[in-house]
């Protein structure tokens, strides 16, 4: 087998920037930053914007879109021309 053809698979700390939540997992991501974890070891640090700790679907703060407002806005803008043509 050829040497150095596969990326380095190692433990990496992922830090959610919006909720300040961090976790260690294995990844091939390349990072320039590192952090000392709770166990005293130094790991590469990958900063992410959203994780399961901050995503609305997982936190239960998901908002449902109100599409009725869009339909009413469309009807006000274009009227009911489509309804007249169908008759």
Swiss-Prot record:
PANTHER family: 50S RIBOSOMAL PROTEIN L31, CHLOROPLASTIC, LARGE RIBOSOMAL SUBUNIT PROTEIN BL31C. Belongs to the bacterial ribosomal protein bL31 family. Type B subfamily. The keyword DNA-binding does not apply. Part of the 50S ribosomal subunit. NCBIfam families: L31 (TIGR00105), PRK01678.1 (NF002462). Keywords: Ribonucleoprotein, Ribosomal protein. It comes from Ralstonia nicotianae (strain ATCC BAA-1114 / GMI1000) (Ralstonia solanacearum). It comes from the Bacteria. Transmembrane segments: none annotated. Pfam families: Ribosomal_L31 (PF01197). The keyword Ligase does not apply. The gene is rpmE2. Gene3D superfamilies: Ribosomal protein L31. This is Large ribosomal subunit protein bL31B. GO terms for molecular function: structural constituent of ribosome. One of its GO terms (cellular component) is ribonucleoprotein complex. One of its GO terms (biological process) is translation.
């Amino acid at each position: 087998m050829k040497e150095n053809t596969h990326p380095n698979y190692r433990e990496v700390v992922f830090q959610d920037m919006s909720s300040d939540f961090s976790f260690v997992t294995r990844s091939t991501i390349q990072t320039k930053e590192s952090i000392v974890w709770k166990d005293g070891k130094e790991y590469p640090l990958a900063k992410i914007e959203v994780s399961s700790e901050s995503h609305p679907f997982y936190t239960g703060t998901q908002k449902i879109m109100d599409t009725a407002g869009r339909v009413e806005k469309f009807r006000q803008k274009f009227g009911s021309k489509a309804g007249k043509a169908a008759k």
